[in-house]
Amino acid sequence: MTCTLKSPPKMASFFLSSLVLMFIAALILLPQGLAAYKLTPTYKPPDSELPPYRNFVPPFALNPVYNAPIYKTPNSPPIYNPPIYEAPPTYKPSKKRLPPPFQKLPPFYKQAPPSQKLPRVN
């Protein structure tokens, strides 16, 4: 395909028009975003003069041996009870023992009593 002055390539015109639209959108939206950030910033510096880590009050006592919560008294019940572990169910065989399957014979395989004589097959 040859490119002449009468018909510019369609891909380049689409690319240029999309660039112009993005530039116009940035000119409009960027100042609005900056103004919104100026009015309601996402970060508020602390009001005190101390650094933020000095304002932190630890929730536990500073005793390294036993760090109990400050709000817990010695006579109060425990705050968290861990769940009691229950063993998973195990297989329990039935108490009634069945004879093994090779001892259960169908009626036509049962042996005839010794007093009864069976016909001979030659």
From Swiss-Prot:
Entry keyword set: Nodulation, Repeat, Signal
Entry comment describing in which tissues the protein is expressed: Root nodules. In early nodules, expressed only in the interior of the developing nodule with no expression in other nodule tissues, including meristem. In slightly older nodules, expressed in almost all cells of the central zone. In more mature nodules, expression is restricted to the invasion zone.
10 X 5 AA approximate repeats of P-P-X-X-X as annotated region, ranges: 45-117
Domain of life from the UniProt record: Eukaryota
Factors inducing expression: Expressed from day 6 after rhizobium infection. Persists up to 43 days after infection.
Annotated signal sequence range: 1-36
GO terms classed as biological process: nodulation
Keyword Repeat on entry: yes
Cystine residue pairs: none
Keyword Aminoacyl-tRNA synthetase included in the entry's annotation: no
Region ranges (Disordered): 90-122
Sequence ranges of the Sequence repeats: 45-49, 51-55, 58-62, 68-72, 77-81, 82-86, 88-92, 99-103, 106-110, 113-117
Name of this protein: Early nodulin-10
